[in-house]
Amino acid sequence: MARSYDTLWRLIYGGNIMLREERNLETIPVGSLGIIPLEGCKALGNKVNDYLVKWREESKNEHKSTIAFSGYQRDTYIVDAKVPRFGSGEAKGIINESVRGDDLYLLVDVGNYSLTYSLCGQVNHMSPDDHYQDLKRIIAAVGGKARRITVIMPFLYESRQHKRSGRESLDCALALQELTSMGVENIITFDAHDPRVQNAIPLKGFETVQPIYQFIKSLLNNIDDLVIDSDHMMIISPDEGGMGRAVYFANVLGLDMGMFYKRRDYTRVVDGRNPIVAHEFLGSSVEGKDVVIIDDMISSGESMFDVAKELKRRKAKRVFI
């Protein structure tokens, strides 16, 4: 049987046994790299591109000359793309070069309010909804021709609406499902409000990069007299939402932890929420200690200021947010 298979192989290939180059799965790229930073993320996109150009020029790789590495080393990896708007305020995505077979990375900052557009004679600031729609327009312009699409979204769109309370929409889950249905394979974000939202797309890639290491490194590099032990420092969660992160910080650094809980007046609604009556503290004394406040998200910042003031009233030494 083995001889017959060998004979068949020789007949098909005219007696020439073709030597196959073994695929190096650790280094071989999925496709030619392409970066599309949307308008609100141009600065970050340019920095990423400059780093990659320099790194690939300096890196040594024995496989660079193979056909699989075609387009590996280039002057730029940024794809020429734009999202112009019509006079009606509507827009369209345009890609001015081929992305067929490319490994595309789309960068979008949905929280960039500095961008504006004109509509009916009025200047409008771009909202997260506008940025998200532009992202979908670029994905639609790709037309399914890319080998793989990865979306890098530093602030996860609709991450505040990650769970349902009553008759509410699950916007974050819907957005993730919509992106993956359009062909997105991976979504990369930073410190998602609730990483469990990835349950909406269990068969696709979802990475939430935690900033804990960078935060601790920044503290140590900039505060010379910082002493990290339970006698000199304490981790504080301003509410129940930041508990998970605060517990992790405290365990990593070997520190005690305290928390505040928001006492609300549920008989009234002000600006769409129940007003906070007081911040009640649970934990040991903070007197004379440096305290680090760890929260999951800052919106207006009012609660963070109130917590910091209360900690100083309790004679905390320094407050780091």
Residue ranges and their predicted role:
Residues M1-I321:
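PRPP-associated nucleotide enzymes
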